[in-house]
């Protein structure tokens, strides 16, 4: 490996989506001498243990569902048994490895210096980099970006919790399990539960309340929980794990409270914790540079991604704002433009309102803007008009009633002009549907604008422009 530079204009700590996007914009677009330091694989959580391998697994689950449904369309298709998880995992891992290589080549193409190692702040303008061979180098930088992301957590207070794995460990599972327990009520737990269930795994999902995805609109919560129970996910409501035991064969016994009673399930192959993430700031030397964090350990930033220390910035999950890959990328690119671009970009910043988000559940969920309770709190119920529709997508027309998944849409409109301030959808294709409607909501579209768009028939999405 060539010696690393001792001086740079822009040093990025963290080679995930946000860090790489910012460094590439700085170097490739504005000609700034830039360096990225990353101790793991390039691409961060999203590429390696998040969005990308998760979506590939989601597609595998969709194929399994399609095979099951094929007979309703006249195909005599046998379920391929057993599902070849090892081959699937090998191909998924190879795809991720290709992306790692693409990220590295993209950095090289934009003339960003990439250093595989661990960075630690020594001062507001200097960083100690520990390379793979243990040697250390000090790099002085005019500006520093912290984009180190976060790590999934495992609760330490539950006896035997260490026998479980976190969401990262899910992608290391070598064989398709027969029985899995997941703990959590957010994106990750819900997505994993849906995928595993579709692949034929007995799936237990432990949640603390009556619904999951509790930051989403109540309609989404209610419809999705009911559907998960219908398709066979064992949702343990108002539950709390009390202990975990592991037998000589490696099987787990999960002890838990559900409602008022004590219960347990045995012969569990994997326990997956999906109970939140913490910022990856340990050992980063934030105190040496005077970078402040909040009570949860997230780096404090203002609306321009400035930290408490001049010339040190932060983007992505380490800030604890909207923890989504495209948000980190967008914030990073705007930061690069503000710092290194022309004068008219000096006040550029990311607007964190109306960020679209999708849960690759079964069925998919899409959401942008305010939930109904949030809209009531902001505008008052008397100033809102709520449009709702529930129906069965045409895809299910050939199937028996008990095999039909739901579709439910909601538009939340505010004021006399009926500006669309919230849009929430659950049903087939919601992830793809939401992107275009997200543009409309961000442009300030009204209900009349939606109505004036000619429907595309027959589609599920046409319902959003024909709501009454």
Swiss-Prot record:
**What Pfam families does the annotation carry?**
Pyr_redox_2 (PF07992), Pyr_redox_dim (PF02852)
Q: What compartments host this protein?
A: Cytoplasm; Mitochondrion
Q: Which cysteines are joined by disulfide bonds?
A: 46-51
Q: Which residues does the entry assign to the active site, renumbered to this chain?
A: 457
Relay the cofactor remark from the entry: Binds 1 FAD per subunit.
Protein keywords? Cytoplasm, Disulfide bond, FAD, Flavoprotein, Mitochondrion, NADP, Oxidoreductase, Redox-active center
Where on this chain does NADP(+) bind? 185, 188, 191, 208, 214, 276, 323, 358
Which EC class is the enzyme in? oxidoreductase
Required co-factors:
FAD
| The reaction(s) this protein catalyses | 2 glutathione + NADP(+) = glutathione disulfide + NADPH + H(+)
Q: Which family does it belong to?
A: Belongs to the class-I pyridine nucleotide-disulfide oxidoreductase family.
Subunit details = Homodimer.
Q: What else is known?
A: The active site is a redox-active disulfide bond.
Q: What is this protein called?
A: Glutathione reductase
Organism listed in the record: Neurospora crassa (strain ATCC 24698 / 74-OR23-1A / CBS 708.71 / DSM 1257 / FGSC 987)
């Amino acid at each position: 490996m060539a010696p690393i530079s001792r001086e740079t204009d822009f040093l990025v700590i963290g080679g995930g989506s946000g860090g790489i996007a910012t460094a590439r914009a700085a170097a490739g677009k504005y000609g700034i001498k830039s360096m990225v330091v990353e101790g793991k694989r390039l691409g961060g959580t999203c590429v390696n243990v998040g969005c990308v391998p998760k979506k590939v697994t989601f597609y595998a689950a969709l194929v399994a569902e399609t095979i099951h449904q094929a007979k309703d369309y006249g195909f005599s298709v046998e379920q391929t048994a057993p599902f070849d998880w090892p081959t699937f995992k090998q191909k998924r891992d190879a795809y991720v490895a290709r992306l790692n290589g693409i990220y590295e080549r993209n950095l090289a193409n934009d003339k960003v210096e990439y250093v595989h190692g661990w960075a630690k702040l020594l001062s507001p303008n200097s960083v100690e980099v520990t390379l793979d061979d243990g040697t250390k180098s000090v790099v002085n930088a005019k500006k520093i970006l912290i984009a180190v992301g976060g790590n999934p957590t495992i609760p330490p207070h539950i006896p035997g919790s260490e026998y479980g794995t976190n969401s990262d460990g899910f992608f290391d599972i070598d064989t398709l399990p027969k029985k899995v327990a997941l703990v959590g009520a957010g994106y990750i737990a819900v997505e994993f539960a849906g995928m595993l269930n579709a692949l034929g795994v007995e799936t237990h999902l432990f949640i603390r309340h009556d619904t999951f995805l509790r930051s989403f609109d109540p309609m989404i919560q209610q419809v999705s929980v009911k559907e998960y129970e219908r398709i066979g996910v064992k949702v343990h409501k108002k539950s709390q794990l009390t202990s975990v035991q592991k037998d000589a064969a490696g099987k787990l016994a999960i002890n838990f409270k559900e409602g008022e009673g004590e219960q347990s399930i045995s012969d569990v192959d994997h326990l997956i914790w999906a109970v939140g993430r913490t910022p990856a700031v340990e050992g980063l030397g934030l105190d040496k540079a005077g970078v402040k964090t909040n009570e949860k350990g997230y780096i404090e930033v203002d609306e321009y991604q400035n930290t408490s220390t001049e010339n040190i910035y932060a983007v992505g999950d380490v800030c604890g704002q909207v923890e989504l890959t495209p948000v980190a990328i967008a914030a990073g690119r705007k930061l690069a433009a503000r710092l290194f671009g022309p004068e008219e970009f000096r006040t550029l910043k990311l607007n964190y309102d109306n960020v679209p988000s999708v849960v690759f559940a079964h069925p998919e969920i899409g959401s942008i803007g305010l939930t109904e309770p949030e809209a009531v709190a902001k505008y008052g119920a008397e100033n809102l008009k709520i449009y709702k529709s529930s129906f069965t997508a045409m895809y299910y027309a050939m199937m028996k009633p008990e095999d039909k998944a739901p579709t439910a849409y909601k538009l939340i409109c505010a004021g006399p002009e009926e500006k669309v301030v919230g849009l929430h959808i659950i049903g087939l294709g919601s992830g793809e549907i939401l992107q275009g409607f997200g543009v409309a909501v961000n442009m300030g579209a009204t209900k009349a604008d939606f109505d004036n768009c000619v429907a595309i028939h027959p589609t599920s999405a046409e319902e959003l422009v024909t709501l009454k």
